[in-house]
């Protein structure tokens, strides 16, 4: 009897111990599940929250596949609300070189980014008296096949990017590196029904894969695309005997490479290099009043130049870009450091600088201007829980531009080149700015983003730019968005 009691007690003790172990194990597993759930929490930064605000649009790679770009992504971006092209500007000048214009504030107030990095090659082109440049802009340095998405920000949503983005921002995001070898080749052609309109074709490739799996990866893409110029007589003669020039032809050659090094779980280093060449095919545009380029007996004094230039390449842009980016993911937040250098060589024939002949070609000899831009940027995002859940963003940037231009600082006429009194062939400017943004989770239905940016320019002085964006959910089906910025 005593032995049976002892065995029963021992059995109960074992069962109890097993039950306790099972309960303890359940507690441990439950705790692990909770910890895993907490690790999956996503903190939305002010930048990402603003992209959900009023005035933000996203174009995906699927959208670009459904309606392929013929030559320039501006053809697709113009479909977004508030976006137009400068061919419909008030002056109508340089209408055959159309640039992205957001909210009617002109291309000078539209900032073009590639993977968040500004592109400003168009600044190497002479700025006309009426605020137009003879340029295609900076929206065609990345082939459509290499694009993952395009972000279009308008109004208050673009305030964090400063005065150059008063109209808005177009951020072209390229495809990321992959841990498996992937590649693609794209061939595209567009043949218009009207034989006087220029046809287009594009050939591009994209290749990505690992060098050391999970550690070092690469991406390489290249592109060649060409759109022929319209015929010189595509538009009818006016009563005054002038004729509007057709669409200028364009030829693009681009190649870009990326090396991505995953240093460890917290840090990564990315090296980007790209080289591009853009050239035109002249159609007779002379900015203010186009003569009939098909009439060799025109009374216009410079028509001989125009006739001699038809179908030729009158301007060529070369762009080299190098960027090194370090990203860190730490227990307290995220950091991003960027060093970038861009060089643009703008090779074109001289033009008259003032009066009626402004923008008219006057020589067959091309001149070259050079724009060098050096940029350093630092940004950190820190999640906080002080009174309200929030994500604080702190950033600073320093930019230096050096411009060498012997063409736009001389007066060109039929008799030759006359140097202006002041020497502005070499110019230099510096801008430094800092910004603070905070994304507050006021309630489950209310998000508030406050921001302020301070700019200091070596030529134009200082400026403060505050901004506010708010998103309010109204039930399951409606959301109210608003914003204000200066």
Model regions and ranges:
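N-terminal periplasmic "start-of-domain" segments of outer-membrane beta-barrel proteins
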Residues: 38-70, 99, 124-132
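N-terminal periplasmic accessory domains that precede
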Residues: 73-76, 98-101, 113, 137-140, ...
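Extracytoplasmic beta-strand/coil segments of soluble accessory domains associated
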Residues: 74-121
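Short acidic/polar hinge/loop motifs at secondary-structure boundaries
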Residues: 118-154
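Periplasmic-side early beta-strands and strand-to-turn transitions of outer-membrane beta-barrels
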Residues: 178-307
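Repeated loop/turn-to-beta-strand initiation elements of outer-membrane beta-barrel proteins
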Residues: 181, 214-218, 266-271, 330-336, ...
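Transmembrane beta-barrel strands of outer-membrane/channel proteins
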Residues: 185-189, 220-226, 271-277, 337-343, ...
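Structural signature of Gram-negative outer-membrane beta-barrels, strongest in the C-terminal barrel
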Residues: 262-264, 274, 389-391, 397, ...
